[in-house]
């Protein structure tokens, strides 16, 4: 019998637990939230006429600033490369340790953990929350819920507010928000992120992971028998029962592993799509084993191949052999390869870029003296920290006369970290070869007119269209 595609949500009230994995999750939460909230306020001196915010996505200026690095619009391949690295990183972690990203560092997990912390501080732990949930709307329930929702809303507002600071100068935007003079886009973005954070982390929680996120389904293609996941050693724990009963396994069916699970699953039923590999059930089970005097590890991180070995009474392989195998090594090599390529491209990129766009409406113009003229839009990017002066030249011109609109010469000054826009005209005399046909081996060259060497710094191929081309 097939299961329904969607099941109505049953509220989950995870019990507070302490242990190594819970501590690791708290540290990751604190560090990741600290980085997210504080990064927009870091300053970085880039000189005059440039923003001093260390990390800034300047949509209006069409540039991305990352400390001492500037990414220009034509360098979007750097962003694509970073996205590829992020994807390969997820493949690597999933192949090695299952959904460890989901359980420890995913924003949905981080904010849900923070909301759960607030919920416990106000309403109490699991049993108190269940009692409050079931009781009628008394004065106690009303004020506790209102207080909890208010704190959630404040966290959500802080989340949305921090995000918009990445897209504008943080102190300036904060002043605009306080004085109610900020751009409407900022207010809309904050509202949307506040609302989604409040709903996703406060009310939907595990449903986002199960129904909205595609990663649980993708991970199936990335995991194999060598992938380390959370597993229940049923050959040791079964049959379940009280410790006073003879012939029973180590599992006393205390339900601690179920009660601490933020996804509400029972790991003893085997690996499930909803499991986010957070390890909280391991902390809960280890605590129970300590109390009843049994060895830890009834629930633990375990590869399927190790499970087969342990069932047979053999010694499992060392963890490093699980992590460093052909699949994970391939992902690691690809990840490192993309990273090295990006670093090399960043270090070797030129300080000047020239982009040429032929004006095609009209394709050419016949002047009063019978000569043919083509027009080109030139975009000169000076990506250095100094003002530069360039001189335009044309190779393979075969008698073409270059000129710049609004200028008597061919020199073009471009300020530091700026883009210069010019219109270049190439004119072919009447009866010349370019005027009567197409000249395709043309090169528009940019020379350094202000430096001591004065050599070419950029060149782009172009075509000249005559009357019969």
From Swiss-Prot:
Cross-referenced PROSITE patterns: 4FE4S_FER_1, 4FE4S_FER_2
A GO molecular function held by the record: metal ion binding
Protein name in the entry: Protein RdxA
Location(s), subcellular: Cell membrane
Residue numbers on the Periplasmic membrane side: 45-75, 171-183, 349-469
Residues that bind [4Fe-4S] cluster 2: 261, 275, 278, 281
Alphabetically ordered keywords of this record: 4Fe-4S, Cell membrane, Electron transport, Iron, Iron-sulfur, Membrane, Metal-binding, Repeat, Transmembrane, Transmembrane helix, Transport
The encoding gene: rdxA
Cytoplasmic side: 1-23, 97-149, 205-327
Listed transmembrane segments: 24-44, 76-96, 150-170, 184-204, 328-348
Residue ranges of every copy of the 4Fe-4S ferredoxin-type domain listed in the record: 242-270, 266-295
Pfam families tied to this protein: Fer4_18, Fer4_5, FixG_C
Membrane topology, from the record: Multi-pass membrane protein
InterPro entries, per the entry: 4Fe4S_Fe-S-bd (IPR017896), 4Fe4S_Fe_S_CS (IPR017900), Cyt_c_oxidase_cbb3_FixG (IPR014116), Electron_Trans/Redox (IPR051684), FixG_C (IPR032879), Ig-like_fold (IPR013783)
Cellular component terms per the entry's GO annotation: plasma membrane
Protein residues bound to [4Fe-4S] cluster 1: 251, 254, 257, 285
Described function: Predicted to be involved in a redox process.
SUPFAM superfamilies: 4Fe-4S ferredoxins (SSF54862)
